Each structure stands twice: as C-alpha cells, then as structure tokens.
Regions:
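Secretory-pathway glycan-assembly enzymes, especially type II membrane glycosyltransferases
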Residues: 1-181
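Catalytic binding pocket for nucleotide-activated donors in carbohydrate/polymer assembly enzymes
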Residues: 179-302
Length: 302
C-alpha cells in the first residue's frame, strides 16, 4: 500500500478543519501558556527541548515562520483548536488534538535493522523488553503483561521508572532483566508491541524488520499513519490486554508462512511510504504551510 501525499497530510491534520480559518492565526501566549510551548525562530535559545531539538530546529528552518507551537512529551495534547504540532493523537480521547509532526524522530525513526536475519533463522518465540513506563500506574499495561506472561515467555523489564518508587508492591525483583540490544529482538519471530505513555517506540523498526509485530489495534496516531495498518496484513492482532496471546501464538505456529508474509508486508509498508527523504520533506513543508496560513485545502495541491 503506497500512501499519497494527500492521504498522509489529511491524516496528520486529523481533527483540524482543512479550511480552518479565513485569516492568519493569532498565536496568543496567554491562551496557550499552560499547554504547548512556542518556538520563536529568532531566539535559538528557546529551542532546547531534549530529544526533540533536531526536529524542532528542522521544522523552524523549513518555513519562514516567526513562531511555531509545539507540544512535546508523551501526554496527548487536548488543548484548544490551534495548529499545535504534536507527536501523537490518542484515539481513545476525543479531545486529543494537534497536527501530527515527525517529532522525536531519532528515537522513533531509527530503522537500523542491519543485524536482522532471515525469517527461517529466527527463533519461534515471543520476546519483549522495555521500561515500566506510564503516567498512570493504575493503567500501566506493561506491568499486567509481564506479570501474566513472565513465567511462560521471555518477557521482562529492562528498567524500572519512577512508578516503582511510588508502588513497589506491584513489582517483583525477578521481572527486571536489564537492557537488550535490537539484535536480541531480531532473533525472534514474534515481537509484542506495548504502548507506554503513548505509542511504542519500537513499532516502526519492528515493522521494517523480518519479524512480525503482535499488537492490539493501534490506539495512537503518529507519523506512521497507523490507521492504514491492517490486522492480518501488516501485524497480528491481539486483544488490548493481550489476554489471548497464547491462543494467537498457537495460530502463528500453525501458520508460519502466513506470518512470514505479514512480516514482509509490514516491511514493505515502511519502505514504500517513509524512506524517501524528498517525500518526507515535501509533506512537512505542506503541513507548515497550513500552520502559516491557517487556510489549507490539500485537494488543490499538486
């Protein structure tokens, strides 16, 4: 499936009205002070935002904008309808807004799978490592997942976050096994995708690999255009709480060739849509044009 520029731009704009406003936007810091932050392109010192720095600088440089609003971090932005650039939107939250941008790309779009191996050389196993991330300890899906499957599959935490200090009674020391390399993941066929604060940072490179993602229907919208991923075509679907993981794995092991085909489709989705730098830059510029003018109709763009 090859996505057109129009499809992707419309997807990234999301909740925004394509004919959003008939006049240029009036960015009022008083209205948005408690929500995103504003980058003043004339003051480079304000560009310091941890892992987001290179992407923020790129967006500022690609368009003649004096100011751009960003909402960084992992909590979906739910503010007013201003064209704020965000990393993700939450489909479970109707108030989740923003124009999707390719933020924190160094983490989410490092597609280095140079150490990948052929499907038939991979272990017929499930493998997962990650931190116990999550803003809300009581909805932390990763803790439930490791608690349920630690004794059956090679799933464990690589690190404990601040949640461990606030609720240590939810954890077991044996669940912590330390950091694993990407190569460790790629030795296995079946790689679960578990959301953290927002989307899993591993989804993109796992799709690009010869392994197959096992995941619920995507909750978060991002630069990846998750709505265009099809269950049984690009990934193998499980229930949101992974309660049917073992049943799904039984099917996978009985349908090895179909699983390999799904893995190839995922890799093709990535290679066809997100690896051409000219296309990526063109789409970014189109989004910035929408923000600058406040009046943008993608159907009239060549």
């Amino acid at each position: 499936m090859i996505l057109s520029d129009e499809q992707r731009i419309s997807y990234y704009l999301g909740h925004q009205n394509l004919n959003f406003k008939e006049e240029p936007f009036d960015f009022s810091p008083h209205e948005l002070f408690d929500h995103p932050f504003c980058v003043d392109a004339r003051n480079k010192q304000c560009l310091s935002r941890a892992h987001y720095d290179p992407d923020i600088i790129k967006y500022v440089s690609l368009n003649n904008l004096e100011k751009i609003w960003f909402c960084c971090g992992d909590k979906p932005y739910t503010g007013v309808n201003y064209p704020v650039l965000v990393k993700t939107r939450d489909t479970f939250n109707k108030l989740s807004k923003g124009v999707i941008a390719n933020l924190n790309s160094g983490r989410h779009w490092n597609l280095d799978i140079s150490q990948d191996i052929d499907w038939n050389d991979k272990k017929n196993e499930v493998f997962w490592r990650g931190a116990d991330t999550g803003h809300d300890i009581h909805r932390n899906d990763r803790i439930g997942f490791v608690s349920k499957y630690f004794s059956e599959h090679d799933v464990a935490f690589s690190d404990y976050s601040q949640n461990y200090k606030s609720a240590p009674y939810l954890y077991k020391n044996e669940w912590l096994k330390g950091f694993c390399t990407r190569q460790d993941f790629l030795k296995r066929k079946f790689l679960p995708i578990l959301d953290g604060n927002d989307k899993s940072s591993s989804l993109n490179w796992i799709l690009a690999s010869n392994s197959v993602p096992i995941m619920p229907k995507p909750r978060f919208h991002s630069w990846l255009c998750e709505d265009f991923l099809e269950s049984g075509v690009h990934y193998i679907e499980v229930q949101p709480d992974f309660s049917d993981l073992n049943i799904v794995l039984d099917w996978c092991r009985e349908n090895d060739e179909e699983c390999e085909s799904i893995a190839k489709n995922g890799a093709k989705f990535i290679s066809e849509n997100f690896t051409n730098q000219e296309t990526e830059t063109r789409i970014i510029k189109s989004l910035l044009e929408f923000i600058r003018s406040g009046l943008y109709d993608i159907k009239n763009k060549g």
